[in-house]
A protein has these predicted regions:
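Conserved catalytic cores of phosphodiester-cleaving nucleases, focusing on short active-site segments
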Residues: 22, 44-67
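Acidic, metal/cofactor-coordinating or nucleic-acid-engaging core segments within structured domains
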Residues: 81-101, 112-114
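Acidic carboxylate-rich catalytic motifs and surrounding loops in phosphoryl-/glycosyl-chemistry enzymes
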Residues: 33-39, 99-108
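Active-site metal-binding core of divalent-cation-utilizing nuclease and nuclease-like domains
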Residues: 28-51
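Non-catalytic C-terminal interaction segments of nucleic acid-processing enzymes
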Residues: 2, 6, 20, 24, ...
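Amphipathic coiled-coil/heptad-repeat helices and related helical stalk/stem segments
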Residues: 15, 38-40, 83
């Protein structure tokens, strides 16, 4: 498992920073993680009281600022299409929305966006087969990837 490597541990630390930032804005909600020692269909659930409110996929980026994400990537978030499909299935089974969390560590910002609800994508998603990094630890793979426009995402700023 990637999570057992030094780079994997950095990913775990970044997800914890994501959780703390989210919960600082929404203290009534909890970010409940899936186990990190085995593959999971999604990264977390958003829970308030005894109710599940959303399925969450979280990605953390250390290689860019918010400005670079905007200027060079046009606010397009790349997520494997398999992960998107898995999260949509989980959201349907739980009858809750699927929300994307993109934490940009150098800028200490969390972009959040509802991606899917009630059997429908909430905005256009582009699917392309591209060569991307295979895992946290490197390597490359050719696979279907989704590009999600985050330009209308909520921006939660840390240390504000």
């Amino acid at each position: 498992m990637d999570i057992l490597t030094p780079k994997g541990q950095i990913s775990v630390d970044d997800e914890q920073a994501t959780r703390r930032l989210w919960e600082s804005y929404y203290p009534d909600y909890r970010y409940i993680e899936t186990p990190k020692n085995k593959p999971a269909a999604f990264d977390a659930l958003l829970v308030k009281g005894k109710n599940i409110y959303a399925v969450v996929e979280t990605k953390c980026r250390r290689d860019m600022t918010l400005e670079k994400f905007s200027a060079e990537y046009n606010m397009q978030w790349l997520v494997t299409y398999k992960k998107i499909r898995d999260c949509c299935i989980a959201a349907d089974l739980l009858a809750v929305p699927f929300v994307g969390f993109l934490y940009i560590q150098p800028s200490n910002v969390l972009l959040t966006k509802e991606i899917y609800r009630d059997g429908m994508f909430q905005q256009h998603i582009t699917i392309e087969q591209t060569r991307t990094q295979a895992t946290t630890n490197g390597g490359y793979v050719l696979r279907d990837n989704a590009y999600i426009n985050m330009s209308q995402a909520k921006i939660l700023r840390g240390d504000a």
